């Protein structure tokens, strides 16, 4: 079978690797254009482009999905099926109708839960105990197509979005190959999603990392995990931005204003929240590397009563 693969980030790499090891032929790759990256903002290829170049597979990087200079070479590849993992663009009907066997998508959630661009992060943020991969036939909606296969995995208590995503990516590759095998064998029946159970997982923005200390400690602990590695959960202490990388919840009846440091131990800071204490154990102050609280306290002093704020202090206007 002739397959075109569409994908962009590291999450998509195991899917392409699995296809390359399968009995099918990957005849072309579609990935997003090179983007500025790093401090120098030099143009860098996507992880999928890097893999495609290494395997000497033809590549298309469309700026406009309806442009003839993209659609004509795509059609010339004559794909029987298009496989998509984290491509990052919506496919219009002209593409969806191109391959005789349709377009199959690998999605990082248990659909219809968490449709959208950040399903892994939101599953952790919301404190879910499990998640998984769903393969589906694509339509013009946002992850609304009929489901093909689905497999669950646990979310471990210590998981961050960054540790969970690679496990899901590997599962996605395996499930993609199995989905295609069953489609070719004619033994797979698409199942419509239950719209009443659908939830969304919108793309995270930098400002989503701001810590709202009025939330419960458990919710904040989950947010710290779900926002790692990007954008990171952050707050401001003594006018400086602090990113909190590791934290746990401690049940308590503490009534001090949320965000207040009420105890400093050798290993952690205990901070009040809307319900319970957040035990902070790993941080990254502004212009610093990631540190355990113990490492930070070896050279700095934190005093109970100091308080985290949602933003830096605002200077009063000069008369």
Region spans (language model):
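A residue-level signal for conserved active-site and pocket-lining positions in enzyme catalytic cores
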Residues: 7, 29, 52, 82, ...
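Amphipathic, non-transmembrane alpha-helical secondary structure
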Residues: 13, 17-21, 71-75, 177
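Donor/substrate-binding cores of folate-linked one-carbon enzymes
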Residues: 22, 32, 81-200, 205-207
